[in-house]
Amino acid sequence: MTKENICIVFGGKSAEHEVSILTAQNVLNAIDKDKYHVDIIYITNDGDWRKQNNITAEIKSTDELHLENGEALEISQLLKESSSGQPYDAVFPLLHGPNGEDGTIQGLFEVLDVPYVGNGVLSAASSMDKLVMKQLFEHRGLPQLPYISFLRSEYEKYEHNILKLVNDKLNYPVFVKPANLGSSVGISKCNNEAELKEGIKEAFQFDRKLVIEQGVNAREIEVAVLGNDYPEATWPGEVVKDVAFYDYKSKYKDGKVQLQIPADLDEDVQLTLRNMALEAFKATDCSGLVRADFFVTEDNQIYINETNAMPGFTAFSMYPKLWENMGLSYPELITKLIELAKERHQDKQKNKYKID
């Protein structure tokens, strides 16, 4: 059987660089190497692109994926053809955060006309920007917690007014978030104005735009969505924490998080969550995959928190585990995502690019 040529891209110029490497390690070890000829491209923290061809062995440590000493090549050379001498059947970007899941690299793949896994330019960008995402959810009628947003330049000029707005509109605790970052990087839970000021200072180190959200005493529920024009959603799972706040450290380092799949919820609540996840997928015109995150209160009030256009595939990750619960194994999920990428690219070829 002739193998298909796949290129996995990971790393990236982002605060989520190490998360991307963890994800790449998991996917490389799970992908069907009898079906796929796999090359990898590592993007350093400085933005250099380095390639390694024909990965066949198990990746036992993330250290093996830091290709710092590899030859830096032009991007067009890296993606022109695989190490087998044939064009790539699909590129699989496993990049998290800015320059990876925000539409930028997706735009590159579009210009190069390369099939790629995951969301397109618009859906990736709108899912990355928490303010734009919330505005799209609002337009779709999806329930959300109160929030405000502002720019670094606005805060520097109107700090007093913005702090007053937060205190007038929201109740503590609140969560301060960089608008364009994931994996809980730069996020703070603030219980008073002093902590709020520190949280704002911390978040502005990562982005020029912040979102401050009302906190709520609720369970954190997640639903995985898979597909293109006709997506499917899993039964919900729950993030069960041994910590007060599900931050970067608890997500990826401490292991103080357990996943309960499926979540212990009434069936009607589970069905509502599945339907809302599909609505969120459509609201941001997604394709391939999305993880939709929700809050569910004790009286079963549901609020959508966000969608993640490139959810992680690490050992702690909810997305692949939700699909395993639906009967789709990890290797089968990877294969399905590649097939969806090819399907979307084939559909794009139906478009006309000149007027007769």
UniProtKB/Swiss-Prot annotation:
Pathway per the UniProt entry: Cell wall biogenesis; peptidoglycan biosynthesis
Annotated PROSITE patterns: ATP_GRASP, DALA_DALA_LIGASE_1, DALA_DALA_LIGASE_2
InterPro entries per record: ATP-grasp (IPR011761), ATP_grasp_subdomain_1 (IPR013815), D-Ala_lig_Van_CS (IPR000291), D_ala_D_ala (IPR005905), Dala_Dala_lig_C (IPR011095), Dala_Dala_lig_N (IPR011127), PreATP-grasp_dom_sf (IPR016185)
Enzyme Commission (EC) number: 6.3.2.4
SUPFAM superfamilies, per the entry: Glutathione synthetase ATP-binding domain-like, PreATP-grasp domain
Residues the entry annotates as binding Mg(2+) 1: 293, 306
Keywords carried by this UniProt record: ATP-binding, Cell shape, Cell wall biogenesis/degradation, Cytoplasm, Ligase, Magnesium, Manganese, Metal-binding, Nucleotide-binding, Peptidoglycan synthesis
One Pfam entry name: Dala_Dala_lig_N
Cleaved signal peptide residues: none
Gene Ontology biological-process annotations: cell wall organization; peptidoglycan biosynthetic process; regulation of cell shape
Keyword Nucleotide-binding found: yes
Gene Ontology cellular-component annotations: cytosol
Cofactor note: Binds 2 magnesium or manganese ions per subunit.
Main location: cytoplasm
Localization of this protein: Cytoplasm
Reactions listed under catalytic activity: 2 D-alanine + ATP = D-alanyl-D-alanine + ADP + phosphate + H(+)
Biological function: Cell wall formation.
Protein name: D-alanine--D-alanine ligase
Lineage, highest ranks first: Bacteria, Bacillati, Bacillota, Bacilli, Bacillales
